[in-house]
Amino acid sequence: MQAACWYVLLLLQPTVYLVTCANLTNGGKSELLKSGNSKSTLKHIWTESSKDLSISRLLSQTFRGKENGTDLDLRYDTPEPYSEQDLWDWLRNSTDLQEPRPRAKRRPIVKTGKFKKMFGWGDFHSNIKTVKLNLLITGKIVDHGNGTFSVYFRHNSTGQGNVSVSLVPPTKIVEFDLAQQTVIDAKDSKSFNCRIEYEKVDKATKNTLCNYDPSKTCYQEQTQSHVSWLCSKPFKVICIYISFYSTDYKLVQKVCPDYNYHSDTPYFPSG
C-alpha cells in the first residue's frame, strides 16, 4: 500500500475548503479528508463514480519507473461556472486588498539660514612667497538675503612691500599703475554699487634672522588687515583686484568669481 498526499486550495464562495489528504490503495479507491463544514448546496468535488476527466495520464510518467508503482486515477467533477458579474466582483475585491498605501508627501526643503555664503575663505586666496616676503590674502563673499552682500578680505604679510586689494568691475584693465587701480568707469557705476563698510590694519616690526642668510639679521614688517565692502544689487559681477609692489617683486592680479554657480540667472560678460 502506498499513500500520497495532495494539497489543493479551492476558493468556493464564501468558504475555503482544503483537501488535505488522499490515501490511495492498490484497489484504486481513494479516501478523502476535508477540513471545514460542507454545505448542502455545494457538490462534492472528488468522487469515485465520475467519468468526466482523468489526470492519471499526467501523473503516470512520474511513477512508471518505480517498482510496484500504481497508476493514479484521480477524477474530479467539472465545477459550476461563475457568472460574469461574480468574476468582476471577485476582481474588484482582490484589487482593493492589493492597493498600495498612498505615499506621504515630502515636505519642501526650507532654508532656515538668513545668510547665504556664496564664497568661503578657501574659495579665494592668493599666496606669494619670495626671499623677502611671505604674503597670504584670503577672501569670502556673503549674501545677506535682503538685496545686499558683503565682501571680506584679510591679509597677512611678513616682509616689506605695499599691498592693495580692491573691488573693480570686469572691464578693469590689469596694469602696473597704482593710480588706475581704483578707478571705476561711469558706464559701470550703475551696475557696481559698493562701499567700504569696515577696515582695520595692524602693523608690527621686528628683527629676525634673514631667510637667505641666517647669519644676518633682517628687518621685517608684519601686517594684518581686515576690510569689508557692502554692495547692493542688482549688479552684473564684481572682480577682485590685487596689486603688490616690493623691491624685488611686483604682482597685479584680477580675479572674477563664477557667479553662475550661485545665481539662478546666468551671467553673460560683456566688453
UniProtKB/Swiss-Prot annotation:
Its main location: secreted. InterPro entries: Nxph, NXPH/NXPE. Highest level in brain. GO terms for cellular component: GABA-ergic synapse; glutamatergic synapse; synaptic cleft. The keyword Signal applies. May be proteolytically processed at the boundary between the N-terminal non-conserved and the central conserved domain in neuron-like cells. Coiled coil: none annotated. It is found in: Secreted. Residues 22-97 are annotated as: II. Residues 1-21 form the signal peptide. Belongs to the neurexophilin family. This is Neurexophilin-1. It comes from Rattus norvegicus.
